[in-house]
């Protein structure tokens, strides 16, 4: 006799439901919010998006639809946290606009399946807005650290 496959569709449904409620923006285990911000958004030397996005997608096991890399150091981006607070897109008041524009690359997903994700690159020179929070254990010892890239302007 072969295996009873009557429960197989139910198993697939449950797996699909679990995957759909798993947040795509969840911070990977063992990383602080600032460390995850660094992986997703700090890239001092520009790389082509297909290569650069590997480091992001390897944590999430999916092709992230869009991502922006700031071509600056974490330290320089963190200095924005010392500038006046502005309201974030989510209504919180812990966002800060950079003092000057920076070089950045916006990566837009064009096709493929993880791990073979393909992206289009768009080099730009713009201001950024970051959300900042007090550092967690393991973060650099700044009063506030960037934890979310809120907007590019």
From Swiss-Prot:
The keyword Secreted applies. This is Ribonuclease K3. Interacts (via N-terminus) with bacterial lipopolysaccharide (LPS). Pfam families: RnaseA. GO terms for molecular function: endonuclease activity; nucleic acid binding; RNA nuclease activity. Kidney. Disulfide bonds join 49-107, 63-117, 81-132, 88-95. Ribonuclease which shows a preference for the pyrimidines uridine and cytosine. Has potent antibacterial activity against a range of Gram-positive and Gram-negative bacteria, including P.aeruginosa, A.baumanii, M.luteus, S.aureus, E.faecalis, E.faecium, S.saprophyticus and E.coli. Causes loss of bacterial membrane integrity, and also promotes agglutination of Gram-negative bacteria. Probably contributes to urinary tract sterility. Bactericidal activity is independent of RNase activity. It comes from the Eukaryota. It is an enzyme of class 3 (hydrolase). Belongs to the pancreatic ribonuclease family. InterPro entries: RNaseA, RNaseA-like_dom_sf, RNaseA_AS, RNaseA_domain. PROSITE patterns: RNASE_PANCREATIC (PS00127). The record marks 62 as: Facilitates cleavage of polynucleotide substrates. GO terms for biological process: antibacterial humoral response; antimicrobial humoral immune response mediated by antimicrobial peptide; defense response to Gram-negative bacterium; defense response to Gram-positive bacterium; innate immune response. Residues 1-26 form the signal peptide. Substrate binds at residues 64-68, 89. The keyword Glycoprotein applies. The active site is at 41 (proton acceptor), 148 (proton donor). Transmembrane segments: none annotated. Glycans are attached at residues 30, 58, 85. Its EC number is 3.1.27.-.
């Amino acid at each position: 006799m072969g295996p009873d496959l009557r429960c197989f569709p139910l198993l697939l449904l449950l797996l699909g439901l679990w995957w759909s409620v798993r947040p795509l923006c969840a911070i990977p285990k063992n990383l602080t919010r600032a460390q995850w911000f660094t992986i997703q958004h700090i890239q001092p030397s520009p790389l082509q998006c297909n290569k650069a996005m590997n480091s992001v997608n390897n944590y999430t096991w999916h092709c992230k639809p869009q991502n922006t890399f700031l071509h600056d150091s974490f330290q320089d981006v963190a200095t924005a946290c010392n500038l006046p607070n502005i309201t974030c897109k989510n209504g919180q008041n812990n966002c800060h606009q950079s003092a000057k524009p920076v070089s950045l690359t916006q990566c837009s997903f064009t096709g493929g399946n993880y791990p073979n994700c393909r992206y289009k690159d768009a080099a730009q020179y713009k201001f950024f807005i970051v959300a900042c929070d007090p550092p967690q254990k393991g973060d650099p010892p700044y009063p506030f650290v960037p934890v979310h890239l809120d907007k590019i302007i």
